[in-house]
Amino acid sequence: DLITNSYTRGKPRHVTSWRNLRTRDVCKKSPGKCIHNGCFCEQDKPQGNCCDSGGCTVKWWCPGTKGD
């Protein structure tokens, strides 16, 4: 999907940037909301946020959405 890391032809694909996610309306405008992959969407969070270039870590998964 747009956010999680995946591999294409053996090369890792980078996590979609915050700006691109906002442009695509993937992230909610208000912080703390869950989006389709279960990450909390907060621009100002340190490492591990789905809308940051660092990607999304387990810490920010919303309950019950890890399988999405």
Curated annotation (Swiss-Prot):
| Modification after translation, per record | Contains 4 disulfide bonds.
Task: Identify the domain of life.
Answer: Eukaryota
**Could you tell me the keywords of this UniProt record?**
Disulfide bond, Neurotoxin, Secreted, Toxin
Q: Which GO terms describe its molecular function?
A: toxin activity
Indicate where this protein is primarily found: secreted
Q: In which tissues is it expressed?
A: Expressed by the venom duct.
Q: Propeptide residue ranges?
A: 1-23
Instruction: Enumerate the subcellular locations listed in this protein's record, separating them with semicolons.
Output: Secreted
| GO cellular component: a single term | extracellular region
Domain remarks in the Swiss-Prot or TrEMBL record: The cysteine framework is XII (C-C-C-C-CC-C-C).
What's this protein's name? Conotoxin Cal12.1p1
Species the sequence originates in: Californiconus californicus
